[in-house]
């Protein structure tokens, strides 16, 4: 897959033209995009917001889980019950970028939103 033609949706600040990829398991970017649970996600989200504000050539790379982090409810005995809800990401824009990598000798498809 050739990513050379990918363009940021804003003009890059000439002071920050070095291309940078930020890898994280969590990104707290928006509540609707629930791919975070706490500190790591908020830190990564803050880095993304700062990079956007500075107009850096910067992308975040993480995993978009089908079921994401679970919600919780309380049982009658006050124990916690996990609730796995399939997440809806229809608000994300499809970039059309899709490619295959190999993990432990198995093909895994990667899609970019």
Residue spans for each PLM region:
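Catalytic cores of carbohydrate-active enzymes across secretory and cytosolic contexts
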Residues: 1-113
């Amino acid at each position: 897959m050739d990513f050379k033609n990918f363009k940021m949706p804003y003009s890059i600040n000439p002071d920050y033209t070095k291309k940078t990829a930020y890898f994280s398991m969590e990104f707290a970017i928006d509540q609707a995009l629930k791919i975070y649970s706490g500190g790591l996600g908020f830190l990564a989200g803050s880095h993304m917001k700062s990079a956007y504000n500075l107009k850096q050539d910067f992308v975040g790379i993480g995993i978009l889980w089908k079921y994401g982090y679970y919600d919780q409810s309380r049982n009658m005995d006050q124990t916690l019950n996990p609730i796995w809800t399939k997440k809806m990401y229809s608000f994300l824009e499809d970039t059309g970028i899709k490619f295959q990598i190999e993990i432990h000798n198995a093909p895994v498809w990667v899609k970019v939103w």
